[in-house]
């Protein structure tokens, strides 16, 4: 009877606790912070935002990242709400538009100023109308309004603030009123749909990066009052073709038109005093560049990767031009060769210095360096993809080469050094030191067979890029040996240089190091690699390289086509074995493969790889990196792999795996699809160990889903217990220093499917 009497009170108590906990949880998620001056500076919580009576100011980033649908101001003497937006009490200041506002928005005619970030992150707004009463907009007004297409600005607006429309990726056009005198930095940065811009003549100042990354901007008109094109103003406007009204510009700052790859013409003013560093870098379609008489300074790389011809006014005291090339005033330094000039580039006589990037990226078929030039560096020819030959003068004393300078120019097949040069000579199109000891410059487009001179001692990585079919050297050479068209060290133990056009390769008996092949693998053409039966360090099977006993797969050939199944004798795979396997389409990892927990299988640039299947076996953890595997569509994992670490998976990949492992999470991370192959048992609960005389008793809670349990260490199985009802077993004292693991298993398709293990330390 007493139980029935107090039951309603008990239920009321439980309900009160539940409501209290729920309220506490909600309160824990909400933040409402007001400082001692009355500024609301931090908020998170309900999308309906109450502006309490103690709030007299709103911080500029108070609602950053917060979803808001409307503001309420009941009882507040400083603010009011109109249609859910927040205003000052007198209605002259628009403070905040709710971030979830959709469609169009019209600012009331009472508003004179729009506050900092007022519309920032209103990602659903499509159009805004600003009345003529507004004269001031603060920074970041419309930043990141991704769907905003149209904005009508006030005719009395005096300036456009910093980042005002930055990230408005749908904004197609905008009319800037003639009342505007300045536009601040990044005002239209990353407006990727903006197609044209016309600056009224009232504008005298436009800040840096104002239109940078407007990748669809095709046409721009500058204001007549502008005297400078600011830093990075049109940087990366890749579709920009014309810039109008430039005749009054006195300064073009650095990066101003960088990467405007379709910019065809630019009118250079008589008033133009300076052109900044990289101002026209990579303006690939820029035609004739005319340097007027008043231009005093041209910065580093100003026209690198640009122009088809340079013309310098004859009265310019600082620069000159000859044969379409830009030179210093005395004609001694080549500042820039026009990259769009095709055919033979014959650098004028009198030039004794060549700027570091004067030639890079040029379309020339040959380059002749004039007498008088004494110093050059190999990377000065970087990107000259049409280049077939280079002619060096007898005056050349120094040719600088740093590690990594090797050029991969597929057409370059001839280097010629003028007779009489005391420092270098050329033979069969290759440049050597005068004593023949060093390869100085090997033309990477050279094809066929090549024989290294007997005197040569060092090649470094100068032959890293080649298109040779074979490389040989005299048997009398003290420094190198050659077998089967491959160059080795004098003892034949390691590869020094490999002919990149070679389709197959046999590793000789003496070779014990193939690291060179790994370094150049991305450029190899080999479909298969065999190994001499006398080699003690390597073996091969089906054209794939293993260690001598076939336990470790070391190297999969770049051009080996189709699917591949790892032999069952293989226990390990080198982390980079499948890097740059360009023709591999599918891979099966067999049951005996095991791997250190902290090792990763790399499949970088396996461009045709579509699927990988891992068989049930030794692996319980797998780490893979799929950089450049854009066609990968399917991964299949067994129940034994509990944890996966999958990096750079392409979006949309399908993973076939087991529930209660991490396969599903991996698929979700890649925005892909998870296909369940079943569910592994849950972790055993209640596991505990106690000592009983000379042995230990392990106990656990029974699991109804289990078909049995396995008790084991890292080295061996202790017990294999059948039946879900088993809840304990004894462990011999010899395992007293070991970590003990227990896991449940169930039978599916006549095979054991193990769950995750629970570990316990006996000691």
Cite the ranges covered by each PLM segment.
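Short strand-edge motifs at loop-to-beta-strand transitions and within beta-strands
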Residues: 727-729
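Pro/Thr/Ser/Gly-rich low-complexity, intrinsically disordered linker/stalk tracts
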Residues: 679-705, 749-763
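Short beta-strand elements bearing conserved aromatic residues within extracellular beta-rich modules
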Residues: 709-711
């Amino acid at each position: 009877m007493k139980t029935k009497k107090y039951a309603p009170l008990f239920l009321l108590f439980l309900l009160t606790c539940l409501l209290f906990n729920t309220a506490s949880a909600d309160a824990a998620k909400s933040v409402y912070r007001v400082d001692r001056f009355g500024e609301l500076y931090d908020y998170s919580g309900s999308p309906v935002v109450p502006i309490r009576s103690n709030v007299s100011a709103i911080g500029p980033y108070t609602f950053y990242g917060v979803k808001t649908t409307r503001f309420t101001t009941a009882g507040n003497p400083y603010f009011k709400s109109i249609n859910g937006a927040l205003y000052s009490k007198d209605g002259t200041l628009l403070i905040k538009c709710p971030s979830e506002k959709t469609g169009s928005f019209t600012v009331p005619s009472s508003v004179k100023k729009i506050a900092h970030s007022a519309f920032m992150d209103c990602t659903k707004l499509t159009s805004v109308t600003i009345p003529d009463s507004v004269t001031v907009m603060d920074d970041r007004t419309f930043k990141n309004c991704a769907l905003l297409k149209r904005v009508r600005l006030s005719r009395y607006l005096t300036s456009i603030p910093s980042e005002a429309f930055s990230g408005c990726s749908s904004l197609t056009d905008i009319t800037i009123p003639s009342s505007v005198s300045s536009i601040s930095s990044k005002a239209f940065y990353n407006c990727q749909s903006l197609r044209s811009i016309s600056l009224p003549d009232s504008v005298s100042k436009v800040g840096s990066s104002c239109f940078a990354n407007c990748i669809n901007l095709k046409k721009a008109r500058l204001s007549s009052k502008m005297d400078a094109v600011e830093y990075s103003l049109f940087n990366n406007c890749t579709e920009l073709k014309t810039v109008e009204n430039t005749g009054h510009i006195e300064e073009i700052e650095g990066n101003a038109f960088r990467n405007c790859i379709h910019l065809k013409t630019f009118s250079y003013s008589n008033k133009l005093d300076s052109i900044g560093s990289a101002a026209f870098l990579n303006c690939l379609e820029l035609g004739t560049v005319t340097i007027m008489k008043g231009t005093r300074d041209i910065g580093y790389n100003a026209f690198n990767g640009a122009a088809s011809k340079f013309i310098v006014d004859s009265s310019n005291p600082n620069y000159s031009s000859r044969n379409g090339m830009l030179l210093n005033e005395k004609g001694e330094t080549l500042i820039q060769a026009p990259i769009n000039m095709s055919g033979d580039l014959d650098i004028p006589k009198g030039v004794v210095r060549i700027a570091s990037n004067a030639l890079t990226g040029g379309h020339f078929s040959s380059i002749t360096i004039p007498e008088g030039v004494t110093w050059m560096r190999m990377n000065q020819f970087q990107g000259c993809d049409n280049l077939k030959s280079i002619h060096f003068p007898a005056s050349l004393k120094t040719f600088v080469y740093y590690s990594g300078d090797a050029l991969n120019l597929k057409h370059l097949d001839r280097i010629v050094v003028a007779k009489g040069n005391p420092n270098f000579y050329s033979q069969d199109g290759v440049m050597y030191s005068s004593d023949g000891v060093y390869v100085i410059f090997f033309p990477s487009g050279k094809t066929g067979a090549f024989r290294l001179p007997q005197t040569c001692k060092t090649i470094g990585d100068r032959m890293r890029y080649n298109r040779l079919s074979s490389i040989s050297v005299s048997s009398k050479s003290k420094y190198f040996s050659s077998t089967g068209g491959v160059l080795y060290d004098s003892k034949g133990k390691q590869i020094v240089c490999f002919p990149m056009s070679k389709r197959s390769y046999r590793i000789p008996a003496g070779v014990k190091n193939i690291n060179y092949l790994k370094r150049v693998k991305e450029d190899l053409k080999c479909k298969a690699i065999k190994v001499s039966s006398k080699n003690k360090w390597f073996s091969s099977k089906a054209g794939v390289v293993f260690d001598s006993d076939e336990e470790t797969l070391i190297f999969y050939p770049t051009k080996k086509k189709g699917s591949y199944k790892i032999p069952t004798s293989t226990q390990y795979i080198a982390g980079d074995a499948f890097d740059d396997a360009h023709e591999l389409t599918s891979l099966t990892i067999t049951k005996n493969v095991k791997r250190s927990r902290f090792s990763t299988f790399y499949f970088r640039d396996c461009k045709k790889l579509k699927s990988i299947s891992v068989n049930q076996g030794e692996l319980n953890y797998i780490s893979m990196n799929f950089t450049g595997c854009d066609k990968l569509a399917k991964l299949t994992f067994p129940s034994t792999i509990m944890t996966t670490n999958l990096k750079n998976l392409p979006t949309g990949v399908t993973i076939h795996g087991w529930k209660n492992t991490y396969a599903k999470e991996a698929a979700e991370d890649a925005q892909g699809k998870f296909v369940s192959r079943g569910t592994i048992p849950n972790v055993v609960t209640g596991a505990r160990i106690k000592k009983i005389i000379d042995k230990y008793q392990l106990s656990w809670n029974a699991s109804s889903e289990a078909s049995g349990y396995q008790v084991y260490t890292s080295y061996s199985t202790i017990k294999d217990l059948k039946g879900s009802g088993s809840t304990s077993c004894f462990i011999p004292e010899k395992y007293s220093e070991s970590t003990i693991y227990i896991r449940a298993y169930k039978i599916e398709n006549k095979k054991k499917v193990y769950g995750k293990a629970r570990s316990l330390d006996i000691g």
